[in-house]
């Protein structure tokens, strides 16, 4: 793996450099765990280049199934980075990795990549606040699952979690397992029920105690993952784990709130939650 040591390959720099706008870099980050490079979009707040002595918090943004590292690098992401005064880091999850270290595919080690390799790489390259108080993680759908999965399991790395309509218990969605790529991640369900159970966010949530995490969930009432997120909410409530659960009213159609426009609205709320955490040390929407 020596070929990856210290390797940095910037393939596109400064996609947006107009005055007052976040600066975007698309980079390739080496992963020793997977033996290859992963595309990552990094969003730097406009102030980053003007204040060379300032260190910035970092928000890791995980895309959903079928999307890529550019998903969060939209107008909402850029505005969030500028107004929030944080660095946005958007890794590519190979389409449908579910941000797991796959128990059936050793070539997919995305938990290790994001929570360990990417965090270390970002902290070594950019002026970051290199502690959990300076890091948060968010994502939508598969990315919301990923944010919870990594945030619950790496509490010393990420200080706040923003779950946007996450697939936090996909066992109830049997008809979608194949198209969502879950069989490639976790194997056949009937032959690997224990593996599937261990890899659900609701299973990890049951291990949490009050104060372990700062979590905000945003989900629409017209979302096929609504009940999954309500289940997560019930588990945390029953265990007296403080968290925020926000439901936004949508149409009755179960897909009306599982869209990019809804994600953008939810992301703006999540970014406000993170700003409060970074500036006051307390996660909240006040």
Sequence positions of predicted segments:
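Non-catalytic cap/lid and distal C-terminal segments of serine-dependent acyl enzymes
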Residues: 20-286
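N-terminal secretory signal peptides that target proteins for export/translocation
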Residues: 1-3
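Bacterial N-terminal signal peptides
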Residues: 6-16
């Amino acid at each position: 793996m020596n070929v990856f040591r210290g390797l940095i390959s910037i393939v596109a720099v400064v996609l947006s450099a107009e005055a007052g706008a976040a600066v975007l870099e698309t980079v390739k980050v080496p992963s020793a765990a997977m033996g290859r490079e992963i595309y990552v979009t990094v969003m730097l707040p406009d102030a980053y280049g003007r204040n060379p002595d300032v260190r910035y918090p970092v928000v890791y943004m995980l895309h959903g199934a079928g999307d890529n590292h550019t998903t969060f690098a939209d107008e909402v992401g850029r505005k969030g980075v500028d107004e929030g005064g944080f660095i946005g880091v958007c890794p590519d999850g190979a389409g449908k990795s579910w941000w797991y270290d796959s128990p059936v595919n050793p070539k997919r080690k995305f938990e290790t990549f994001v929570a360990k390799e990417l965090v270390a790489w970002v902290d070594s390259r950019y002026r970051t606040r290199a502690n959990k108080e300076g890091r948060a993680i968010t994502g939508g759908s598969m990315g919301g699952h990923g944010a919870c999965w990594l945030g619950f399991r790496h509490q010393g790395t990420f200080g706040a979690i923003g779950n946007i309509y996450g697939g936090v218990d996909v066992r109830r969605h049997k008809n979608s397992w194949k198209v969502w790529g879950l069989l490639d991640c976790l194997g056949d369900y009937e032959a690997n029920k224990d593996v599937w159970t261990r890899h659900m966010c609701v299973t990890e949530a049951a291990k949490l105690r009050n104060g372990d995490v700062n979590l905000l969930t945003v989900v629409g009432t017209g979302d096929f993952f609504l009940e999954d997120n309500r289940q997560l909410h019930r588990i945390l409530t029953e265990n007296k784990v403080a968290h925020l659960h926000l439901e936004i009213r949508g149409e009755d159609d179960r897909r009306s709130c599982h869209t990019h426009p809804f994600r953008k609205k939810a992301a703006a709320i999540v970014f406000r939650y993170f700003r409060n955490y970074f500036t006051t040390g307390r996660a909240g929407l006040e």
